[in-house]
Amino acid sequence: MKTKAKMAAKCLSSLVKMAMGDKIRNRQMVDITADMLWNIARHYRHKETLLNSQYYNVHAIVPHLNQWFTVYAINTELRAAHFLAQACVETANFSSFTEVPRDGGREYDAGTRIGRNLGNTEVGDGPKFIGRGLLHLTGRDNYTNFGSEFDKDYITDPTMVARNPYVAVKAARYYWDLRHVNTAADRDDINKVTLLVNGGYNGLEERKMALIRAKRELGII
């Protein structure tokens, strides 16, 4: 009898979790504005070019954020806060959608440990497939799989992931969903979110501060 009771309780618990999951997936999306992004970002004094880039970028990506947030169920304030905080740091406060790696991307080249993990197999793959988009899609494998998901070619011209704001956001949302980052965001686990997005903990303290700013903008704190 106890075993049956435990099984029934476990079944009920699973049904409740499924119902809660459906409830989260079907929630009205969080509305993102350019002002929110501007306030989440830090700004550069006496660097007009970067300020202009920030201003252009935050306005360019807002409609696409709201579109893809709906598709990929970033529809709670907490999920949105984590996504925006990570995007803010990855893009140097929304100033650039292209990574500036320490060695120009050669550290990702075929034959290196990182390069092998990223699926870089040809000479020049490291610089060619540096991080681009809001969450810095990196490596031949990721560009290939992203293109396959949407029946597009991002291998011939990978710079499209950074040059086109729509694609920059779409790539980030694709990677967020691929890595199941919503689960860590729901737990408010900044360490796990950072690991899933970054592959390490680069800029962790900066990401924590960006998360605080994002939570304030979204009314969480």
Can you annotate each of these PLM segments?
Residues A87-E90, A185-L204:
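Acidic helix/loop microenvironments that form the catalytic cleft of cell-wall polysaccharide enzymes
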Residues M1-I32:
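N-terminal secretory targeting signals
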Residues V167-V169, L178-A185:
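Proteins synthesized as precursors that undergo proteolytic processing into mature forms
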Residues L12, G21, L196-I221:
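Low-complexity, Gly/Ser/Thr/Pro-rich intrinsically disordered linker/tail segments
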Residues N26-A60, H64, F83-Y174:
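Peptidoglycan-targeting cell-wall enzymes and recognition modules
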Residues H64-Y72:
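A short alpha-helix/helix-coil micro-patch that ends at or immediately precedes a cysteine
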Residues V71-F83, S96-V100, N182-T194:
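Surface-exposed patches in mature extracellular/periplasmic domains of secreted proteins
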Residues N66, L84-A87, A172-R173, T194, ...:
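Non-transmembrane alpha-helical segments in soluble domains
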